[in-house]
A protein has these predicted regions:
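Alpha-helical transmembrane segments and their helix-helix packing motifs
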Residues: 2-275
Length: 275
């Protein structure tokens, strides 16, 4: 049976299209963003452990792009102030690939499931399950990246040396410096997750990720996944003992949790809890 196209049908379609365009142009409210965050959290908490593990591993490997790009740029450009600025422009590459590719990143999960826990007062064990699987698999993914970079002929020796030097510099900070800088790093990346949840476009999301992750790199703020590849590269390159990795990792993880949960999730929940 042929479909009749009438002026009324076209009018309705035009009105619907105009409404959708208007919604896309409007800035989402905090409540709308929180609803999207909660929706994302429910989806992640329901995923099978194997799916989370593979996604977390992929996220760790992909995050190696950040260390790879900065190490190559540093080897080619040197360590002057201008060279450092240019090198840092490449720092967000790993974050862009992981977040837009929807791989699991531990610091994003300081926002999504915690927001749902605060809202519904449940999902505690599911959140701990998600955290443990993703963190372990993120770290295993960064180890795989480090092994590929250091233990094969994939990279020129000067790039491997640059990667190991960066990792050594990261790991040799004091515990207090690692912890407090990780709070800022966790705050910024959880804020990225919040803002991307309210973005209507891929290009807008990419710009948000790039701008905020650039600040993380420029300020040398600790990130438990982004910097793991460099630190593990230094370990595999025999510049650091294995114990140095774990000495660096625990304050970085703790600081990222405090920054993500305390400075983003709790505050964003607080502004929407009574509405």
């Amino acid at each position: 049976m042929p479909i009749r196209i009438t002026g009324k049908n076209l009018s309705r379609e035009g009105d619907a299209s105009a409404t959708q365009v208007q919604q896309d142009l409007e800035r989402p409210t905090a409540i709308q963003i929180f609803a999207q965050v909660a929706k994302n959290a429910r989806q992640e908490l329901r995923r099978p452990a194997r799916s989370l593990a593979v996604s977390g591993f992929a996220g760790g490997v992909t995050m190696g792009l950040t260390g790879l790009a900065t190490a190559i740029a540093r080897a080619e450009l040197g360590t002057s102030g201008l060279a450092h600025f240019i090198t840092t422009l490449l720092y967000p590459i790993g974050f862009i690939a992981v977040i837009l590719g929807r791989a699991q990143l531990f610091t994003e999960n300081t926002l999504y499931p915690i927001a749902l826990v605060l809202s519904e007062r449940r999902h505690y064990w599911a959140t701990l399950r998600l955290w443990s699987i993703v963190l372990v698999c993120n770290c295993l993914g960064t180890l795989a990246f480090a092994a590929l970079a250091v233990r094969t002929d994939a990279l020129q020796p000067k790039y491997v040396d640059s990667l190991a030097v960066i990792g050594t510099e990261i790991a040799n900070h004091s515990l207090s410096t690692i912890f407090w800088s990780a709070i800022i790093g966790g705050w910024i990346i959880a804020l990225v997750a919040w803002l991307v949840s309210g973005s209507h476009s891929i290009s807008g999301s990419m710009l948000l990720i790039w701008l905020l992750a650039f600040v993380v790199g420029l300020g040398h703020f600790a990130h438990c996944v982004a910097s793991s590849g460099e630190v593990l590269s230094a370990v595999l390159h025999h510049q650091l003992p294995v114990s140095s990795y774990f000495r660096w990792l625990w304050p970085a993880v703790l600081g990222n949790i405090v920054g993500g949960v305390g400075l983003v999730t709790l505050l964003e929940y607080g502004q929407t809890a009574e509405e």
